[in-house]
Amino acid sequence: MAREINIGDRVAIFATVGKRIEDRVTLHILTANNPYSIIDPKAKPGDRLRFEGDVVFVDEETDRVTVQVLGRVTVEASTVELVRKFERPTYVLS
């Protein structure tokens, strides 16, 4: 894996708006194998949208990550943008 992405990290996924069907638009997410759609009355075909979510699974053998955004989306790790590394909470015992 080129950069280290771990469970709990906040990442961004980019999608391109496809065709419009009434108030919904289809989304094309690079390297995702499933179709997605959202309700967005202002999006036009060709627009690029950014979605942020947390990594819930990392498959190091196939270099893919699953992100909790639009449900769960599995994409190649090289197509996500790291927003924030996960930091464990620190507890102070008194």
Place the predicted regions along the sequence by residue.
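Short, conserved beta-turn/loop elements at beta-strand boundaries and strand-helix junctions
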Residues: 18-25, 58-64
